[in-house]
Structures are given as C-alpha cells and as structure tokens.
Curated annotation (Swiss-Prot):
Key word Transcription regulation present: yes
Entry similarity comment: Belongs to the bacterial histone-like protein family.
Gene Ontology biological process terms in this record: DNA recombination; positive regulation of metabolic process; regulation of DNA-templated transcription; regulation of translation
Gene: ihfA
Organism of provenance: Neisseria gonorrhoeae
Stretches that traverse the bilayer: none
Protein name: Integration host factor subunit alpha
GO cellular component: cytosol
The protein's assembly and partners: Heterodimer of an alpha and a beta chain.
Length: 96
C-alpha cells in the first residue's frame, strides 16, 4: 500500500475536528513544502519519534554504461537520506 498526499489529507479531515478537505490538502502541501525548502537550503530535519532527513555529499565515481560497457564518470551530487528513529523501527517491527 502507498500512502498519498490526498490520503493524508483525508485522514486529517477524519481525525481533526473542524478541518475542511481543502484546508487539510493545504496543510499537507505546506508540510511537505517546508521539508523540501529546509533540505534545499542545506539544513537537516529531525522529527522526534519518526526520524532524520540528512544531506550527504557523494563524490564523483567511475561507472559503466550497461549497454555499451563504456566507462563513464558518475558526477558528484548531494542526496537526501532518511534514518528512522528507534521508536519508528520498533513500531514497524512490532506490526510485522
């Protein structure tokens, strides 16, 4: 199962009183926009009980074109990583 932003908005409408569907959609969109902009500015995000979003700089490295076998460089880049908190890991393990 995949949880979409629309489904998150529906959950907000169901669980929080006096929240309209449009307000819930806006809240969800603002939440993710804040995460995007914070990461884009180079800052890390720590959500207690959930996990950490961290930025990692990966250096250039050699790669290979799978079709031709030709060596090509994979450019340096910045990636986002997520590390789940112990609490989240425990909850996931409990439900498995």
């Amino acid at each position: 199962m995949t949880l979409t932003k629309a489904e998150l908005a529906d959950i907000l409408v169901d669980k929080v009183s006096n929240v309209t569907k449009n307000s819930a959609k806006e809240i969800v969109e603002l939440f993710f926009e804040e995460i995007r902009s914070t990461l884009a500015s180079g800052e890390e995000i720590k959500i207690s009980g959930f996990g950490n979003f961290q930025l990692r700089d990966k250096p250039q490295r050699p790669g290979r074109n799978p079709k031709t076998g030709e060596e090509v460089p994979i450019t340096a880049r910045r990636v986002v990583t997520f590390h789940a908190s112990q609490k989240l890991k425990g909850m996931v393990e409990h439900y498995y």
